[in-house]
A protein has these predicted regions:
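N-terminal pre-core extensions flanking Radical SAM catalytic domains
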Residues: 1-42, 58-59, 213-260
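Core AdoMet radical
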Residues: 2-14, 25-48, 60-75, 86-102, ...
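A general structural signal for stabilizing positions within well-ordered secondary structure
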Residues: 56-57, 107, 147
């Protein structure tokens, strides 16, 4: 037996979204933008290792398999792996919800599943942070999967400097939970200056979300990271034709001061 295995970009990093808080190597779309912005000087796709993996897979009876990204529903080989799994395997999938899930449903309709659909808050928040996303389409695909798997389908978020006070709005739209705080880059909660932090905390106090309140109360402001984040945002706003202040006007003083 192999208790669990995770396919984290083992089939490449193909992805159709450029999420702000992503990182080099995890998303082909993010890499493409970073290359255009001269943040990286080369752009190579992450190679697929599926051939060897599928051969090795035959040696094990896997109890739990997790498919992450890139965007797992864009990677054909993921479905090849799924089709070889025993129906007793719990299959976990993290998807951005933009890809038609019909093939996923056909492949896994008889499996035990846990489907996490990534979003960052309501429509405008998700579409800004997860650039390229269409929240209406995401909701359509979410509902398609929920009709098959019920409460095994849920929204999940990252908890970052931009969205923390908007996450509870997602809870009113569909079944959802707040995921884990961003810790690997400057979109962490430490990039929130004290005045905006107080504003966000007041909003969360009114809602009463204890977990989000604790995360934010424990965050120590790092001004250097805040400016790094805003420069990162400004470069992408110019490239994409977007504007942070259309969705997060509370950042106006800092955004307009930032030389990105």
């Amino acid at each position: 037996f192999l208790h669990s295995a995770e396919l984290n970009s083992i089939g490449g990093n193909t992805c159709n979204l450029g999420c702000n808080m992503c990182s080099y190597g995890c998303s082909s779309k993010y890499n493409s933008e970073a290359y255009k912005l001269h943040e990286i000087d080369y752009m190579l796709p992450k190679p697929s290792n599926y051939g060897k993996f599928i051969e090795d897979l035959k040696q094990f009876n896997i109890l739990e398999m997790k498919f992450t990204g890139g965007e797992p529903l864009l990677i054909k080989e993921n479905f090849d792996v799924m089709s070889q799994l025993n129906k007793d395997t719990l299959v976990r999938v993290i998807t951005n919800g933009t890809v038609d899930p019909t093939t996923l449903i056909d492949t896994l309709k008889d499996f035990k599943v846990n489907i996490l659909v990534s979003a960052e808050g309501p429509k405008e928040v998700t579409e800004y942070i997860r650039h390229g996303s269409n929240f209406d389409i995401v909701l359509k695909h979410f509902d398609m999967m929920q009709r098959v798997w019920g409460d095994s389908v849920t929204f999940t978020t990252t908890i970052n400097a931009l969205n923390i006070s908007r996450i509870p709005e997602l809870f009113k739209i569909r079944k959802a939970h707040a995921g884990s705080p961003v810790t690997s880059n400057f979109y962490s909660l430490s990039s929130i200056p004290d005045d905006i932090k107080e504003m966000y905390l007041q909003k969360l106090y009114e809602i009463g979300n204890i977990d989000l309140i604790k995360f934010l109360e424990n965050a120590e402001y790092n001004e250097t990271d805040m400016w790094k984040m805003l420069r990162h945002i400004k470069r992408r706003d110019r490239l994409r034709g977007t504007n942070l202040l259309d969705v997060f006007p509370e950042w106006k003083e800092y955004y307009e001061t930032c030389n990105g």
